[in-house]
Amino acid sequence: MEFRLKQLRDAVAADAAGRVQEVRYFLDEIEKRADEMCKAERLYREGKLPKRVCHCDTKVNNMMFDEDGTVLCVIDLDTVMPSFIFSDYGDFLRSGANTGLEDDKNLDNVNFNMEIFQAFTKGYLESGKSFLLPIEIENLPYAAALFPYMQCVRFLADYINGDTYYKIQYP
């Protein structure tokens, strides 16, 4: 998260597309939460949180299903790297528990499905009980908030830079 915040701060400093003032409110909201959202890196530096082999792009689109809807495997393995379990847990919830599309024009469609959150968390904890550390389990709610926050930081940095990575279709 620290890396993504640095990218955003660099984008703000450069203001390449002249958009910083129009998004000042959002920048202030991001900065209010920055310290909290960098918790994983702090815990890692303190020796309290391990890095593990993670997929790092565990959205629903990167899962292959059979005709009955059963998950067969995870695809898009070029993103596998050492990271925190929060990466896979939080990123899946960002996409899987979202009731709308990532680029949904109608924000009334966008919500967080608590039933999916609860079912996924139950399955995640059952599957990971043999290796997850207490600090990882305690911070799963943080992970659920981290990835929407991270995407917001990424989208906003790109917008400030002039839509260089994410091509927008509408304001």
Locate the predicted segments by residue:
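ATP-dependent phospho-/nucleotidyl transfer catalytic cores
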Residues: M1-H55, V60-D68, L146, K167-I168
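Hydrophobic alpha-helical bundle architecture
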Residues: Y124-A144
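Generic recognition of stable, solvent-exposed alpha-helical segments in well-folded globular domains
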Residues: F3, F84, E115-A119, I135, ...
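ATP/Mg2+ or Mg2+-diphosphate-binding catalytic cores
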Residues: V12-D15, M150-P171
